[in-house]
C-alpha cells in the first residue's frame, strides 16, 4: 500500500508514485494500491492522468493516523494476512536513496514470484 495526502507535498510523493506505477506494470495492478486522502477528487484524477499513473486508488475521507506526526507524508506499508501494518516506511524527498533501497527489497522479497 502507498498512502498519500493532498496536504502533502506533490514533489515529495510524485517520484514514489512513478516508481510504484512501474512496479504495478511489472507485477500486476493488484499488487500496488494507493490510499489517498484527497477531498477534491478532481485534483487527484488530474495528478494521476497528467503523470500517466495507472494504479488502484482508494480515496479516504480521513487521514490514517498511523503515525500522527507524519499524517501528511507519503507512507508505504504492507498489510499482513492478519491485517496488521508491516514494514512501514515514511517517505520524503530527502531520502530518495532509502526509498530506492526499500522498493528494491519490496520487489525482491514480496513481489517476485519464485
Which residue stretches match the model-derived regions?
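Short active-site neighborhood of thiol/selenol oxidoreductases, capturing the structured segment around
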Residues: 1-20
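Short, conserved loop/helix-junction motifs that constitute active-site signature segments
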Residues: 24-27
